[in-house]
From Swiss-Prot:
<dbReference type="InterPro" id="IPR036121">
    <property type="entry name" value="ATPase_F1/V1/A1_a/bsu_N_sf"/>
</dbReference>
<keyword id="KW-0067">ATP-binding</keyword>
<dbReference type="InterPro" id="IPR000194">
    <property type="entry name" value="ATPase_F1/V1/A1_a/bsu_nucl-bd"/>
</dbReference>
<keyword id="KW-0375">Hydrogen ion transport</keyword>
<keyword id="KW-0066">ATP synthesis</keyword>
<dbReference type="GO" id="GO:0005524">
    <property type="term" value="F:ATP binding"/>
</dbReference>
<dbReference type="InterPro" id="IPR005294">
    <property type="entry name" value="ATP_synth_F1_asu"/>
</dbReference>
<protein>
    <recommendedName>
        <fullName>ATP synthase subunit alpha</fullName>
        <ecNumber>7.1.2.2</ecNumber>
    </recommendedName>
</protein>
<dbReference type="InterPro" id="IPR027417">
    <property type="entry name" value="P-loop_NTPase"/>
</dbReference>
<dbReference type="InterPro" id="IPR004100">
    <property type="entry name" value="ATPase_F1/V1/A1_a/bsu_N"/>
</dbReference>
<dbReference type="GO" id="GO:0045259">
    <property type="term" value="C:proton-transporting ATP synthase complex"/>
</dbReference>
<dbReference type="Pfam" id="PF00306">
    <property type="entry name" value="ATP-synt_ab_C"/>
</dbReference>
<feature type="binding site">
    <location>
        <begin position="169"/>
        <end position="176"/>
    </location>
    <ligand>
        <name>ATP</name>
    </ligand>
</feature>
<dbReference type="GO" id="GO:0043531">
    <property type="term" value="F:ADP binding"/>
</dbReference>
<dbReference type="InterPro" id="IPR023366">
    <property type="entry name" value="ATP_synth_asu-like_sf"/>
</dbReference>
<keyword id="KW-1278">Translocase</keyword>
<keyword id="KW-0813">Transport</keyword>
Length: 525
């Protein structure tokens, strides 16, 4: 066998020319222990907080504890595939999530993988799930209403775009129902919605998604599901995934509504992980930084100025209380972070007042700045009248000998409560809310028995949509979004016609028991 020296030298020269001296350097460690969704890793001395780690069998983790001799990581996948002694590699990346309009209409898990059997998501951009909240100078004041379509909330506890409003109450008081109604009411309002389910039953999530599909709300909604069957690390990550998706839209000038259902279970999952990572426990065994857990999440909701996109994120976190105790650790934390709370009472719920909003205990720190003028004009005395009613109701139980003024206050309060009762998934437009509130403010409902109020609501809304003259007045109010004296009188006259129509159909109706007879005779004139 003969060798051509020239050919060999050419081959060697070619290889020298194409030699790539780049060295790929990877840092790796070893799993010391694994269990309960936590891995302790030795050897990753340069790992950073929140870094993505790669385990064998395509399982990933995230650094959550940095100790002198080891790194504590949460496992974002099947921990049964990991063994002691396995090699763990750094990725030099933090946890990221896909963002953009491709997610609309989809149900994803906390790792942003689709779980709705509708195929892969064609995303073009990702963002890290942890980032500093929008700075003070980048924000705008909250001045635009985010309509929930729920009369009790939009009138007495208004929510503005960019606000954080807590929904708090015992289990089975309608917290999720309010959140779902708020999403359904955003149809055709150019608001994108995100529903983050934390520790919920999978059957509950299926029902939520079916409701959203039924009312055409899934087309502008993303559902992030970290259900009760998911490990604690995924439940911990899910709200941050949700708000990261929202931030992309906010920076592109969109308004976003995000629901966290619920942050009580989020705190429990974080407590579980912290105890397993051997962090020192504090009050109720929660770690010392549980306040920061929620504050850094909720502070990312904002309304930004035009230089930063001009969009907004409105957050409605949900907290579940035990026997109405809002002074527990997590409820007080979240109350102090948010811009107000909607308190749901199990007592009201059991009395049939639904939504069971306790208006006396609820507050919106943004207030009337987040209301259109027409609603602001007619809802001013609502909270006061209800407060007087609840105060007098307690005294009325002790004696039946009441003066006329007290009877009138009790009667008006009972009728207001009936006016605020609303069927689920039946949102009201702002113009319809303004008309209903006008009938309350003008004391027009005093002519009706309490049991006729629900029928009155249906009749008056129907009248202003079907009667030609009334419809024109409704349209005018919708356009100018404020009551002038003439329009107010014209709308009241139409409302009086509805009252007369109902009272004529009541057997043995005696107007004298409700007010001055001559005043009743002038209705509709």
């Amino acid at each position: 066998m003969s060798f051509n020296i020239k050919e060999i030298s050419e081959m060697i020269e070619e290889q020298i020319r194409n030699y790539n001296k780049e060295i790929v350097q990877t840092e790796q460690g070893t799993v010391v222990s694994v269990g309960d969704g936590i891995a302790l890793i030795y050897g990753l001395d340069n790992a950073i907080m929140g870094e993505f780690l790669k385990f064998p069998n395509n399982v990933y983790g995230m650094v959550l504890n940095l100790e002198e001799s080891a790194v504590g990581a949460i496992i974002l996948g099947d921990e049964t595939l990991i063994r002691e002694g396995d090699i763990v590699k750094r990725t030099n990346k933090v946890v990221e999530t896909p963002v953009g309009d491709a997610l609309l209409g989809r149900v994803i898990n906390a790792l942003s993988k689709p779980i709705d059997n509708l195929g892969p998501i064609n995303f073009t951009k990702t963002r890290p799930i942890e980032r500093v909240a929008t700075s003070v100078m980048a924000r705008r004041s909250v001045s635009q209403p985010l309509e929930t379509g729920i009369l009790a909330i939009d009138s007495a506890i208004p929510i503005g775009k960019g606000q954080r409003e807590l929904i708090i109450g015992d289990r089975q008081t309608g917290k999720t129902a309010i959140a779902i109604d708020a999403i359904i009411n955003q149809k055709n309002k150019n608001v994108k919605c995100i529903y983050v389910a934390i520790g919920q039953k999978d059957s509950t999530i299926v029902q939520v998604v079916e409701k959203l599909k039924k009312y055409g709300a899934m087309e502008y909604t993303v559902v992030v599901n970290a259900g009760a069957s998911q490990p604690a690390p995924l439940q911990y990550l899910s709200p941050y995934v949700g708000v990261t998706i929202a931030e992309e839209w906010m920076e592109n000038g969109n308004d976003v509504l995000i629901i966290y259902d619920d942050l009580s279970k989020h705190a429990v999952s974080y407590r579980q992980m912290s105890l397993l990572l051997r962090r020192p426990p504090g009050r109720e065994a929660y770690p010392g930084d549980v306040f920061y857990l929620h504050s850094r999440l909720l502070e990312r909701a904002a309304r930004v100025n035009e230089n930063y996109g001009g969009g907004s994120i409105t957050a409605l976190p949900i907290i579940e209380t035990q026997a109405g105790d809002i002074s527990a650790y997590i409820p007080t934390n979240v109350i102090s972070i948010t811009d107000g709370q909607i308190f749901l009472s199990s007592e009201l719920f059991n009395q049939g007042v639904r939504p069971a909003v306790d208006i006396g205990s609820s507050v919106s720190r943004v207030g009337s700045a987040a209301q259109i003028k027409s609603i602001k004009q007619v809802s001013g005395t609502l909270k006061l009248e209800l407060a007087q009613y609840y105060e007098l109701e307690l005294f009325a139980k002790f004696g039946s000998d009441l003066d006329e003024a007290t009877k009138a206050t009790l009667d008006q309060g009972a009728k207001i409560i009936q006016m605020l009762i609303q069927k689920q998934h039946n949102p009201l437009e702002q113009v319809d809310q303004a008309i209903l509130l006008l009938t309350i403010k003008s004391h027009l409902i005093k002519w009706l028995p309490v049991e006729s109020i629900y029928n009155f609501k249906h009749e008056i809304l129907s009248h202003f949509k079907n009667d030609k003259h009334a419809f024109e007045l409704r349209k005018k109010l919708d356009e100018q979004k404020t009551f002038d004296d003439q329009l107010q009188q014209q709308i009241l006259k139409e409302a009086q016609k509805v009252v007369l129509k109902i009272t004529k159909n009541i057997n043995e109706y005696k107007p004298g028991t409700f007010g001055n007879i001559s005043e009743y005779q002038n209705l509709g004139k």
